[in-house]
Amino acid sequence: MNITSKIGAIAAAGAVGLGLTACGAGDTAANSDTKRIGVTVYDMSSFITEGKEGMDTYAKANNIELVWNSANNDVSTQASQVDSLINQGVDAIIVVPVQADSLGPQVASAKSKGIPLLAVNAALETPDLAGNVQPDDVAAGAQEMQMMADRLGGKGNIVILQGPLGGSGEINRGKGIDQVLAKYPDIKVLAKDTANWKRDEAVNKMKNWISSFGPQIDGVVAQNDDMGLGALQALKEAGRTGVPIVGIDGIEDGLNAVKSGDFIGTSLQNGTVELSAGLAVADALVKGEDVKTDPVYVMPAITKDNVDVAIEHVVTERQKFLDGLVELTQQNLKTGDIAYEGIPGQTQP
């Protein structure tokens, strides 16, 4: 699910929610057209931090006030945050859930009060969502595992770093990984375990595996870039170089790792683009507009061949990219391809 920002304090506070006016037109009292949309995310990971910037950009251009909360990877905290947003009477709620099988009562409550509640980036197992803006995590897992299988020549030993167990990202990326592994009986999984999307946890997990398996480890498949970067740090500290690592998300450090050769590749899930799309769907629902409520974000593969363009969008020319984000988001909603951003290899419908 992926650089701590100025709102990192929210994550540390867990249950504390912070309303951020992102409309540039004054507060709600000053402008009755302002829409208040509540947001609760699993944690302020690098991915979410980048995504928040995209949502803020879209909100400012569309007279939306965002009320932000981070659940610090705690299901009960997130449930309380959704309850609070419902009680505040926000116009819509966006949830990036901690766990797929959570928030059933909260979703039902929002629906009964006519508040559209959307799951974005990670799924919720409920039929009562007003919107469901999701990445194709199965395809992303298959894509990263195929990269690794190709690099290993279909033979070798790997370890797998998983997201938080029970979250839709972990479940579905794992399904994709397993689909590809089934075609390569000579690739053995030495170990797999969660590092909860976190770089520091992945460092410790990888150190333990290096201690247990040593030179038997031929590759590292990480379900997100942050964990892959943690594995990279542990391998370097152990004096091991050249072990192929693959990740998912295309955060700044992950893209730089692809460019340097420390990663063999990643799958770009540009949080700036994806979360902006989620907000655009929520905004359309609030306004009563026709909109596809379940668009799918298909992540492009990022390798040395196209990483430079991805780095421009995420890092070096980020402000230029943000300046065009609202137009891009609206165009993508029309075409149905919410992941399109002109990366070589992508084709616009």
Curated annotation (Swiss-Prot):
Keyword Lipoprotein appears in the UniProt entry: yes
Q: Where is the lipid attached (S-diacylglycerol cysteine)?
A: 23
Q: What induces it?
A: Up-regulated during growth on D-threitol relative to growth on glycerol.
Keywords associated with the record: Cell membrane, Lipoprotein, Membrane, Palmitate, Signal, Sugar transport, Transport
Q: Which residues form the signal peptide?
A: 1-22
Name the gene behind this protein. Answer: xypA
Q: Name one GO biological process term.
A: carbohydrate transport
Family listed: Belongs to the bacterial solute-binding protein 2 family.
What job does this protein perform? Part of an ABC transporter complex likely involved in xylitol import. Binds xylitol.
UniProt source species: Mycolicibacterium smegmatis (strain ATCC 700084 / mc(2)155)
- Say which domain of life the source belongs to: Bacteria
This protein is called: Xylitol-binding protein
